[in-house]
Amino acid sequence: MENIDMKYLHLLAKQYPTIAKTATEIINLEAIMNLPKGTEHFLSDVHGEYSAFEQVLRNGSGVVKRKIRDIFGDELDDAEINSLSTLIYYPEEKMDLIAEEMDDMHDWYRTTLFRLIELCQYVASKYTRSKVRKAMPEDFAYILEELLHENYNEEDKKMYYEEILQHIISLDRAAEFISALSRLIQQLVVDHLHIVGDVYDRGPYPDKIMDTLMNYHSLDFQWGNHDILWMGAASGSRVCAANVIRISARYLNLDILEDSYGISLRPLALFADEIYKNDPCTYFQPKNEDNLNYSKAEITQIARMHKAISIIQFKLEGEIINRRKEFDMNHRLLLQMIDYKKGTIHLKGKDYQLLDTHFPTIDPNDPYKLTKEEKELIEKITASFKNCRRLQKHVQFLYSKGSMFLTYNGNLLYHGCIPLYEDGTFMEMKLRGENFSGRELLEQFEILTREAYVRKPGTKEKKYACDIVWYLWTGAVSSLFGKSEMTTFERYFIAEKETHKEEKNPYYKLRNEETICKQILEEFGLDGECGHIINGHTPVKEGKGESPIKANTKMLVIDGGFAKAYHKETTLAGYTLLYNSYGLQLVSHQPFTTKEDAIKNETDILSTRQVIEMEINRKRVRDTDIGKNLNEQATDLKMLLEAYRNGSLHENS
């Protein structure tokens, strides 16, 4: 007792003023700690593909269907299991289809309600009543609690529950009740969601994904390289805004800016039509990967916009490189390496012919200087990003729930990499005059990313932080990028593929080694023997023999593969991860078709499970980070109880 601060116990006594209340809370905490660990669900690299993301989120990477098989495997055939699964994923839409095929829904409602209640009882069994109650929709909370926490086999209660269900059906509330049960099941099968980066990129609906995540019951977020670009644009970074628009134009995805976020691109269109009106912009034709129906005139205008914003981007990047010598990026000052008369560029000791030599806004004597019109344009565009309420709401959520890395239940989560030298030591970078590496480097990157958003506009601190955010997108020591350089200019203007090459950081080779992974885990304060690294960012090319499980299971690469462009390379849609009380399971997914197909034909994403690590003893809440906090609370309360019993403190009944 000598080491316990009595002031703290006095404060604790205000919340627990009696022996009875203190003892009750200790019992409650011990009971919670003995419950099975909740299921963690890991997703990465969603890339704006809302339909596939929604399906994986609703089915819990196959957890819902597995729970149905646990309960009804001997009672229902595969078709019935698929039908019940689809109902839980999309209750309203599925019931609409069923209602079209049935004249009388009464018996179907009754059977379905009983099945859903039984399933809900099963998935709720690992939680406290209090937690389940909080997850229930308010309208049905009382009835749900009655139905979920009683035994149907007791004859004296059976009729009571039959009557409840009969009234739900007769009062025409069965559909709403089924929807409520379905959503409750979805919520209870996954206790916590980890998004290991990149909601944003080339996909059309990152905004819908963000809306969904903002309504999710429990999650965290590790920022990805594409997320950081949008965060930078929302923070007021001109170069990040230019990059966002360039990528959107390249992949025919300007609708996300104009329709979803209300960011007007009319000033850019007018500027591009004027400056590049006689330019075919051949090498800036957008990629129409989804065969979208655009007219020739629309494609021509988008190509002009694409080129216009690209040139502005290259100029802005040159400005940053020139003022931030510590970024060590002089080799990326490409506009000054062009011979504008010959139409060539001198790179790494060799001259290359440029594919496009029409640069009406570039002054060869001062190539990084924006024209008056370009400057006005990028200021307008950046202001639109800053003033977009919906984007600001989404970015604020990314800041509030996100981080550069996360340690959680003994595992280390990050999107890109931990920058390493060839010998496996941590790469250093100088930030604000001081060298950082490893964990400290990522912590500094996070601090500066937050400063970019909150610092006052016009200050040197704001400008520096915004420049760092851009560096995180493209820099050699960025933990989000993980390559030596980003050869965007070369891909547009030089035919020779040798100039397009981007050398990966040694990390991507070294992460196959168990000793390196253990070293990284220990750098972040985790147990190298028990912990795992959960990494996104790089698609796993299974067709070429790559495996998502590396370094004797220390490294798990879970690029979700949602981006359709990578499906040919990977031969599947990617991976997600589950971590429940029984251990770690990697889930591989086949490509998703459509939501309509999933509902009508009851097609789910075909998933294959691979057990990575099976627990000998089932993990309990006490074995988790939350459990450690609960255990500390219980220890403090036991000290308080002892103080009451030995007379150090007196009860206040």
From Swiss-Prot:
Q: Which domain of life does the UniProt lineage start with?
A: Bacteria
Pfam families recorded = FBPase_2 (PF06874)
Its annotated pathway reads: Carbohydrate biosynthesis; gluconeogenesis
- Reaction(s) catalysed (UniProt annotation): beta-D-fructose 1,6-bisphosphate + H2O = beta-D-fructose 6-phosphate + phosphate
Q: Give the required cofactors.
A: Mn(2+)
- List the GO biological process terms: gluconeogenesis
Main EC class the enzyme belongs to: hydrolase
Keywords, A to Z, come to:
Carbohydrate metabolism, Hydrolase, Manganese
Q: Which GO terms describe its molecular function?
A: fructose 1,6-bisphosphate 1-phosphatase activity
What EC number(s) would the UniProt record show?
Answer: 3.1.3.11
HAMAP family per the record? FBPase_class3 (MF_01854)
- Similarity comment text for this entry: Belongs to the FBPase class 3 family.
Q: Per its record, how is this protein called by name?
A: Fructose-1,6-bisphosphatase class 3
- Which organism is this entry from? Listeria innocua serovar 6a (strain ATCC BAA-680 / CLIP 11262)
* Gene of this entry: fbp
